[in-house]
Every structure is written in structure tokens, then in C-alpha cells.
Regions:
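Conserved Walker B catalytic segment
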Residues: 127-195, 204-206
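Hydrophobic/aromatic beta-strand patches that form the interior of the parallel beta-sheet core
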Residues: 39, 69-71, 190, 217
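Short glycine-/polar-rich loops that comprise or flank the Walker A/P-loop
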Residues: 64-68, 185-187, 212-216
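Conserved nucleotide-binding/hydrolysis micro-motifs of P-loop NTPases
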Residues: 36, 74-78, 164, 194-198
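Short regulatory helix/loop adjacent to the ATP-binding pocket of P-loop NTPases
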Residues: 196-214
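A short, basic N-terminal segment
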Residues: 1-39, 44
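Short, well-ordered alpha-helices that flank and scaffold nucleotide-derived cofactor binding pockets
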Residues: 31, 55-62, 179-182, 204
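P-loop NTPase nucleotide-binding core
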Residues: 43-47, 51-156
Length: 218
């Protein structure tokens, strides 16, 4: 049986050769990131936010000069879960990059030092933490951002379904995140959301911590 090459990819990462249209959006998002701007993307679910972000990350101007991270926080419901998700996905991305990157991550997260386990054959650290290990989420979050600030390349972190943080029981999560992010010089952010009303309010309502801090892509 001959191999079937289906250009209509509906799941997983979309190869560059199969990514159609969205030329203007790709160019704008890439340009904003190259200029060091944070970006908010507002679009309903299943309309291609994730594919657009990953396609942007694949652009030579980005992939050859930045460390890129994508984190989906749709299923999180608290700051503790947010930090757990962010930590686990950063580790998952860094692990294939080699021991230097993994050790940098492990040594940076001092609040978790006692909980690391190691592969008996390779000696590589393994991320086997439970949610309960993140007893000081704000401290761990600060350590993560400090690590990104010290990276030897500029970093881009895309957080999908960012509006979830407004639903956490903790009342100051937006302010906490903004407090960390505003001091970073080596890291840019993409905030993507599918709840257009809520995500728009977070970035355009006077008095909200992220008010007028980003460029917008609809």
C-alpha cells in the first residue's frame, strides 16, 4: 500500500509545508517578538492559535536565536496547578536538549531540591513530582523566571488559555505574574486565550495588572 500524505493536519504539530495562509498573522507575530514585545492572541478554540504560535516558533529568525516554550493551562484551576504545569512542561522541553539544560533547570529550582529523583542508568534527573511538592508556588514561579532571565539565549514563553488565571481562587495571580514579568529583560511572552471577553478585559480594562502591556493579535 502506498503512503498517504494528507495535507489537512487536524492534530499534533502542523509541519511548515502544510501550514496554509495566516501569512500576515505569522509576519506580525514574528515581528512583534523580534522587537521584544509581548503579544496577546484572542481567538475561539479550534481556530488555530496553537498552530500559528508553533509555526511562528519554526520561523528561522525565531528558531535559530531563541529558546521557545509552549504551555497550555486550560486544565489548571489554581496557582499551584499553574506552577506545576509550567515546571513540568519546561522540563519536558528542556530534557531532549541535553544534560547541561536539565542541570540548569534542576539547580535553578531550589525550592524543589529535595524532591528530585535520578535515573539509575543515565544519572539524569526525572520529573516525578506530585502536585503536593509545590508548597510555595510563588517561590518556585520566581525561580523559573529567574532561570529564564539567565538563559544564554532570549526566551519566548507562550501560555495558552491564559484567561484561566483570572478564575483561580487566589485573588492576586494576575498581579503576581505581572510583578515577575515586568522585571524580565531576557524573556518575551505570548498570552493566548479563547474566552475573548475575559482575555480582552484582562488586557484592556484600566486597573487590571496587564492593562496595555501587550500588542494584540485577533
Amino acid at each position: 500500500m502506498s503512503e498517504i500524505n494528507n495535507p489537512f493536519v487536524v492534530k499534533g504539530r502542523i509541519p511548515a509545508a502544510c501550514f496554509c495562509d495566516r501569512v500576515a498573522e505569522t509576519e506580525k507575530l514574528t515581528r512583534e517578538l523580534l522587537n521584544g514585545n509581548d503579544v496577546v492572541i484572542m481567538s475561539s478554540r479550534r481556530l488555530g492559535k496553537t498552530g500559528l504560535i508553533q509555526h511562528c516558533f519554526d520561523q528561522p529568525a525565531i528558531s535559530g536565536h531563541y529558546y521557545t516554550f509552549f504551555v497550555d493551562i486550560l486544565e489548571t484551576s489554581s496557582l499551584q496547578e499553574f506552577v506545576y504545569k509550567l515546571s513540568s512542561q519546561l522540563f519536558e522541553i528542556l530534557q531532549p536538549m541535553g544534560r547541561k539544560f536539565v542541570d540548569f533547570f534542576v539547580n535553578s529550582l531550589k525550592s524543589l531540591q529535595a524532591g528530585w529523583t535520578y535515573d539509575p542508568l543515565s544519572g539524569m534527573p526525572k520529573f516525578t513530582f506530585s502536585m503536593g511538592a509545590f508548597t510555595k508556588p510563588e517561590v518556585t514561579l520566581g525561580e523559573i523566571f529567574a532561570m529564564l532571565e539567565l538563559a544564554d539565549r532570549r526566551c519566548i514563553v507562550a501560555i495558552d488559555e491564559f484567561q484561566q488565571i483570572a478564575k483561580y481562587p487566589e485573588k492576586n495571580v494576575e498581579a503576581v505574574l505581572r510583578g515577575f514579568i515586568q522585571h524580565l529583560n531576557n524573556c518575551d511572552f505570548i498570552f493566548a486565550g479563547s474566552d475573548r471577553h475575559l482575555i480582552a478585559e484582562m488586557f484592556s480594562a484600566y486597573g487590571r495588572p496587564f492593562y496595555t502591556t501587550t500588542s494584540t493579535l485577533n
